[in-house]
Amino acid sequence: MLSALVMWLLPMGEGPRFAMDGALALFALVVFAPIAETLIMGSVLLILLRLVGPTAAVVASSAAWAVAHSLAAPLWGLIIWWPFLIFSTLFVVWRGRSLAAAFAVPAAVHALHNLAPALAIASSPSG
């Protein structure tokens, strides 16, 4: 919904392009990216939580991911901050239970979040 709204408000914006299709797209977007990004995000959050409170750490993390994703497609950052706000919040909340859960839960939610777009990319003829 958020991406559709941004694209409606700013139709000149271009979304990210993925130079892959089929099983590679599914693996990259549903397995690799969520695990790799969660490992990076969680490590940064663990450092931030030593320096600032949980709210500031979550906001800083999601803002950093928005900037990082904007490098690939400028408008993508406007869209991606929200999911990373959720992923970062999940990490901080589940960290109270266990470090393994703090990494596993956001990675699983991220994978599910990426599943529908990954299926669309994987099934498109041009990737």
Give the label of every model feature segment.
Residues 3-4, 26-127:
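Transmembrane helix-loop-helix hairpins at the membrane interface
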Residues 8-19, 126-127:
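Membrane-interface helix termini and inter-helical loops of multi-pass transporters
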Residues 16-29:
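Loop-to-helix transition at the N-terminal end of transmembrane alpha-helices
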